[in-house]
Amino acid sequence: MGSLDGKVALVTGSSSGIGEASAHALAAEGAHVVVNSSSSVDAGMAVVEALPTEGHYIRADISDESQCQALIAGTVERFGRLDILVNNAGWTTRVDHTDHAALTNDILFKTIEVNVYGTWWMCKAAMPHLKETEGNIVNVTSIAGLRPMGSSLAYGMAKAALNSLTEDLAKFHGPVRCNAVAPGLVATPWTSEWGDLHAGISAIAPSGRSATPEDCAQAVMACVTNTYMSGTILKVDGGTTLVL
């Protein structure tokens, strides 16, 4: 018997990386997991097939509000309820923080649209169902929302907004709980070409390495399973923010 037997979880952006690791961690505790991606359909289906519990895949792009609504509706239609929403999907590209000319409106708008609007739309659509089950939300944010660092100024702005959203939902929508997991640099397919950053973090972080998706998934599970945790921004950075 797992601690999440009979629960239904939806993890956005879960065809790889933190989302995939979180899907596996949730399923290992007995949850039915809906896996999502905007484009990597085969990878998403492969994640579902590897889960130890019954899962389901739904393709949706969270930068489109109607697709967010359809993703929530599809989850509830398939499993009859929603207990856990993990907002992991996001987007970024590297832009030097000192080069404002390089931070084009297209980059700024896409970063905000996917990371902020998409997460908000998911929370908005999910909230009525989560209130029925007294469920919980975990937003995957970043230490870039706590310190002036990360892949770009726009990314830091977006993740700071999500940290604020997390606290607001926790304060005003109980008994639904809402927490955030704020990783440092994570070794995922998304950051596989950022070798210089991984080397830099490994050199200065007390942990001596970048995070793994599994490190982050463990933090997601802490937020999901600790029934008195709400409004917490949980850093998973190996001590990086202690030295930067």
PLM features: residue spans?
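Substrate-binding pocket helix/loop in short-chain dehydrogenase/reductase
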Residues: 68, 96-100, 104-109, 201
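Conserved glycine-rich cofactor-binding loop
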Residues: 8, 15-16
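Active-site helix of classical SDR
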Residues: 123, 158, 166
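C-terminal substrate-recognition "lid" of short-chain dehydrogenase/reductases
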Residues: 120, 129-131, 212-236, 241
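Conserved glycine-rich Rossmann-like NAD(P)H-binding loop of the short-chain dehydrogenase/reductase
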Residues: 29-46
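Alpha-helical segment proximal to the catalytic Tyr-Lys
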Residues: 128, 167-174
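Residue(s) in the substrate-gating loop at a strand-loop-helix junction
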Residues: 142
